[in-house]
Amino acid sequence: MKYPLVPLVNELTFSFLASWLCLPVGLLLFLLIVWLRFLLSQDSEENDSDLCFDWEPWSKGPAEFCQEETLHSPEEERPCW
């Protein structure tokens, strides 16, 4: 039997298949939008002191930055990678 007796997609089944194939994609897109809006609203509620960067360590190498950091604050243990 080369072809099925009843085709899978015809005028009656097209809307049913399209809705069941598009429903998970639409639901995932909706959840992604809600999740991103939630994350953005949490970020704006925090204080803006996190946005102030100290750019001096970026001009140094990682070893110099870690050595200087351990000299200034020996009580804090930070890994040097």
Swiss-Prot record:
Q: Which UniProt keywords apply?
A: Membrane, Nucleus, Transmembrane, Transmembrane helix
Q: What Pfam families is this protein classified in?
A: Adipogenin
Please give the start and end residues of each transmembrane region: 16-36
Major subcellular site: membrane
This protein's membrane topology, according to the annotation, is: Single-pass membrane protein
The question of whether Transmembrane helix is a record keyword is answered with: yes
User: What is one GO biological process annotated to this record?
Assistant: brown fat cell differentiation
Cellular component GO terms held in the UniProt record? cytoplasm; lipid droplet; membrane; nucleus
Q: Mind telling me which InterPro entries this protein's record contains?
A: Adipogenin
**Similarity comment:** Belongs to the adipogenin family.
Reported function: Plays a role in stimulating adipocyte differentiation and development.
* Designated name of the protein: Adipogenin
